[in-house]
């Protein structure tokens, strides 16, 4: 049998699902007022992609609405990545990755990949700044997001990832996707990828959880 490759979701899988909504989102929202008044050309170009009037008030309202409704918007994700970078670099943000997930990622390097709706930039920052001054990026082979691969609930996204990591469709079952979201697992299953449901404290209940192989700790793999 071929060496297994693992694709990991982030929140609710390798770190608490509360990290994004209780730490990252509030940190970002505190910066929105200054963000919409920025003179940085890169940020201005991103803001210009929002389908609203470009005055500060309209932009502020639109961004807050996207965040509060947890809309997976690619422009928003890029802006968040920029703001979170400042927080990680200043030490204000540290990622609470589960110890068993840290051990798993290190043990299975270089066969671990990350797939999240957050931007690749934000993913790298998270794994560079893990609590305990741990940098996991050297153990992770690659990162995928909605810009590089597509939405996590669409089978085509997983076909795209298989191609990116050099796995032919006939060997898809040698890839294991671990997530707390059953819709994402179903999309991966549709293209033959093996799946595991992550059952972490605080995760949203999955009505048909018995349908999936499941774990509450990576040490069980």
Swiss-Prot record:
Its cofactor is Mg(2+). Signal peptide: none annotated. Pfam families: Hydrolase. Its main location: cytoplasm. GO terms for cellular component: cytoplasm; nucleus. Disulfide bonds: none annotated. Its EC number is 3.1.3.77. GO terms for biological process: L-methionine salvage from methylthioadenosine. Binds 1 Mg(2+) ion per subunit. Pathway: Amino-acid biosynthesis; L-methionine biosynthesis via salvage pathway; L-methionine from S-methyl-5-thio-alpha-D-ribose 1-phosphate: step 3/6; Amino-acid biosynthesis; L-methionine biosynthesis via salvage pathway; L-methionine from S-methyl-5-thio-alpha-D-ribose 1-phosphate: step 4/6. InterPro entries: Enolase-ppase_E1, ENOPH1_eukaryotes, HAD-like_sf, HAD-SF_hydro_IA, HAD_sf. It catalyses: 5-methylsulfanyl-2,3-dioxopentyl phosphate + H2O = 1,2-dihydroxy-5-(methylsulfanyl)pent-1-en-3-one + phosphate. Belongs to the HAD-like hydrolase superfamily. MasA/MtnC family. This is Enolase-phosphatase E1. It comes from Kluyveromyces lactis (strain ATCC 8585 / CBS 2359 / DSM 70799 / NBRC 1267 / NRRL Y-1140 / WM37). The lineage of its organism: Eukaryota, Fungi, Dikarya, Ascomycota, Saccharomycotina.
